[in-house]
A protein has these predicted regions:
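Core of compact, soluble alpha-helical bundle domains
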Residues: 21-163
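Bacterial N-terminal signal peptides
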Residues: 7-17
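Positively charged n-region of N-terminal signal peptides that target proteins for export
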Residues: 1-4
Length: 163
């Protein structure tokens, strides 16, 4: 578990420090990660990562598995208790699919707009990411694939954290 969370922590640290990460740019120096927009960066022009994750069907299963974890975790529960879980899962599937260059379109709002006023703190953001990685591990997603996804979504940290 430690060797999975260390790259995550590093990516999030870089993403959360403006001196270390350019605004709108990926948190790591991976030439395959290309930002498409502040809402949905695209990892690569190759669909290999999308296929490694098992395509849209597996993204749906991952979201079905992780949502109860977010609701149960005391650090993330307040942000999910009174929300439309099905809509959130659907939009996260779309977002992750686009990030991984799958055949999807993201229909949601920007991360800054969605999270404005929610008072999401770093502890909640990190807990959400930890629960996602636990779920990805349980689903057998290879560590390298997890790290590429986490590195691509880490810059969204700036748009989600309020305090």
């Amino acid at each position: 578990m430690r060797n999975v969370l260390l790259p995550l922590a590093m990516a999030l640290l870089v993403a959360s420090n403006p001196a270390m990460a350019a605004v709108g740019e990926p948190a790591v120096s991976d030439p395959d990660i290309k930002p498409r927009s502040p809402t949905v960066p695209v990892i690569t022009d190759d669909t290999g990562l999308f296929e490694t994750f098992g395509g849209r069907e597996w993204l749906v299963k991952i979201m079905d598995d992780v949502m109860p974890r977010w609701i149960k975790n005391p650090r993330t529960r307040p942000f999910f208790e009174n929300s439309d879980h099905e809509r959130i899962k659907r939009q996260l599937v779309e977002q992750f699919c686009v990030i991984m260059k799958g055949p999807c379109e993201y229909s949601g709002r920007s991360m800054a707009e969605v999270h404005r006023g929610m008072n999401v703190n770093e502890g909640a953001f990190f807990a959400l990411t930890e629960e996602l990685q636990i779920t990805l591990n349980a689903r057998g997603v290879p560590c390298a694939a997890q790290n590429r996804l986490i590195a691509a979504i880490a810059p969204m940290h700036r748009d989600i954290i309020d305090r």
